[in-house]
A protein has these predicted regions:
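Conserved N-terminal alpha-helix of the aminotransferase class I/II PLP-enzyme fold
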Residues: 32-80, 99, 103-109
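N-terminal "arm"/small-domain region of PLP-dependent enzymes with the aminotransferase-like
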Residues: 1-43
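Conserved PLP-anchoring active-site segment centered on the Schiff-base-forming lysine
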Residues: 86-102
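Conserved active-site segment immediately N-terminal to the catalytic lysine
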Residues: 189-201
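Active-site C-terminal subdomain of aminotransferase-like
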Residues: 24-25, 201-293, 297
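Conserved PLP-binding catalytic core of the aspartate aminotransferase-like
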Residues: 301-334
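Active-site phosphate-binding strand-loop segment of PLP-dependent enzymes
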Residues: 125-182, 195, 203
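PLP-dependent enzyme catalytic core of the Aspartate aminotransferase-like
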Residues: 10, 345, 349-377
Length: 377
C-alpha cells in the first residue's frame, strides 16, 4: 500500500485576473456552482438545460436548434466543429494571424483534411481580400475557418465580411469566438455564421471548462450527410444533442454532464441577459478607452492598430530594458494582479491585459494602471 499523502485544503488568495483568461468570476457564479449537485437526468436539471440553451442562443444571437455547451473548454469546442463537419480529403481555407489560427490548421490536418493557409502578420486582422483570393483559387474548398478575436495578439477580424465571402463562394464558415463572445459585437444569424465555438472563462466570467457551440441548419445538414463516421465519440454532436434535446419528452444519456459547472454557466449567461448583450459590448469598449488613455500616458504602445483592436484583450509592447517576468511576478506578489505574458511570436515582447466580463470594471482599470506605474518607475 502507498502511504496516504497529507495536505492542507487548498485555499488560494483572491487574485485580480487581468490576463487573457480565465477572467474574474462573478460572485453569483461561484455561489451558483456551490449549490447542491443533482443527477444529470434530474427533471429540474433538464429544465435548467433548456433555459441554458436559450441563454446561449441569446449570447450568440442565434435561433440555431443545435446550440449547447460542450463539457470541456474552448479547445474542445474547436475540435467539436472540425471533427463533426470536416471529412478526410476536404479542403479548408484557414486564416492564420496568431496562435489560434494555427491551432485551426492543426485540427484540419488531424481530421485528414487539406488546409489552405491565408497568413496575415501577427497583430493584424484577417485580410478579406486575401481570403477572397484564396477562395477564388480553390473553388473546391468546403469551409472557411478564422478566429474572430485572436487572443494571442488582441486583433479583431471582420467576421461579418468574412462570412459573407464564405457564402458567396459556397463555403461553410467555422468561427472561433472564444474571446469575442460577450465582449464585442457578435451576431451569428445576421452574419451567417455556420459553426461557432467559445469558452466559459473569458468575457462570460464563468468558471473554466465549458464551451458554448452552435451549428446553423446548413452545418447540421453537412453533419447528417457525412460519408464517414465522426472520429470522436465524445464530441459527436449527433449523439450529444440527443441529451441536450428532448425527443418525445425523453433525453438520451450520453455522458455525465458537469452539473455544477453548468449551474455556473447558466448563472453567468443569466447575468449577461440581465445586463443586455449590447450593454455588455459597450461596457467593454468604455473600459478599454479608460485603460488605453492610462497606458498611453505611461508611454506604453499597443501591438494592434486602433481600428482592429480588441477592447477586452489589450496587447502592449514591453518597454526596452524591462524584465517581463520580473514585472509580472511583482504585480502578482505586491498587488495580487495577474496580467498575461506574450504568446508565440510575441513571447517576451508584449504583455496582454484583459478586460473581460466581470473584470471590465473601473476599479480594475485603476488598479492596473497604478500598479504598472509604480512597478515600471
Amino acid at each position: 500500500m502507498l502511504p496516504a499523502p497529507h495536505f492542507s485544503a487548498f485555499n488560494p488568495p483572491r487574485r485580480i485576473l487581468m490576463g487573457p483568461g480565465p477572467s474574474d468570476v462573478y460572485p453569483e457564479v461561484l455561489a451558483a456552482q456551490a449549490r447542491p449537485t443533482v443527477g444529470h437526468l434530474d427533471p429540474l436539471f433538464v429544465a435548467m438545460m433548456d433555459e441554458l440553451k436559450s441563454l446561449i442562443q441569446y449570447a450568440f444571437q442565434t435561433k440555431n436548434e443545435m446550440t449547447m455547451a460542450v463539457s470541456a473548454p474552448g479547445s474542445a469546442g474547436m475540435e467539436t466543429c472540425f471533427v463533426n463537419l470536416v471529412e478526410p480529403g476536404e479542403k479548408v481555407i484557414v486564416c492564420r494571424n496568431g496562435v489560434f489560427g494555427e491551432r485551426m490548421r492543426q485540427n484540419v490536418e488531424r481530421v485528414g483534411a487539406i488546409a489552405v493557409l491565408v497568413d496575415n502578420e501577427w497583430g493584424t486582422p484577417v485580410d478579406p481580400a486575401a481570403v477572397e483570393a484564396a477562395l477564388k483559387a480553390n473553388p473546391d474548398a468546403k469551409f472557411l475557418a478564422f478566429v474572430h478575436a485572436e487572443t494571442s495578439t488582441g486583433a479583431l477580424s471582420d467576421a461579418k465580411t468574412l462570412c459573407a465571402l464564405a457564402k458567396q463562394y459556397g463555403c461553410l464558415s467555422i468561427v472561433d469566438a472564444v474571446t469575442s463572445l460577450g465582449g464585442v459585437e457578435l451576431r451569428v444569424d445576421e452574419w451567417g455564421i455556420d459553426a461557432i465555438y467559445s469558452g466559459s472563462q473569458k468575457c462570460l466570467s464563468c468558471v473554466p471548462g465549458l464551451s458554448p457551440v452552435s451549428f446553423s441548419p446548413a452545418a447540421v445538414e453537412k453533419l447528417k450527410n457525412r460519408k464517414t463516421p465522426v472520429q470522436s465519440w465524445f464530441l459527436d454532436q449527433s449523439l450529444v444533442m440527443a441529451y441536450w434535446t428532448s425527443a418525445g419528452g425523453k433525453r438520451s444519456y450520453h455522458h455525465t454532464a458537469p452539473v455544477n459547472a453548468l449551474y455556473a454557466l447558466h448563472e453567468s449567461l443569466r447575468l449577461l441577459a440581465e445586463e443586455g448583450v449590447e450593454n455588455a459590448w459597450k461596457r467593454h469598449q468604455d473600459m478599454h478607452l479608460v485603460l488605453r488613455a492610462g497606458l498611453e500616458k505611461l508611454g506604453l504602445k499597443f501591438v494592434v492598430a486602433e481600428d482592429s483592436r480588441l477592447p477586452q484583450l489589450n496587447a502592449i509592447y514591453i518597454p526596452e530594458g524591462v524584465d517581463d517576468a520580473a514585472v509580472r511576478a511583482r504585480l502578482l506578489k505586491d498587488y495580487n494582479l495577474e496580467i498575461g505574458a506574450g504568446l508565440g511570436a510575441l513571447a517576451g515582447k508584449a504583455w496582454r491585459i484583459g478586460l473581460m466580463g466581470f473584470g471590465a470594471r473601473r476599479e480594475n482599470v485603476a488598479l492596473c494602471l497604478r500598479a504598472l506605474e509604480e512597478v515600471l518607475n
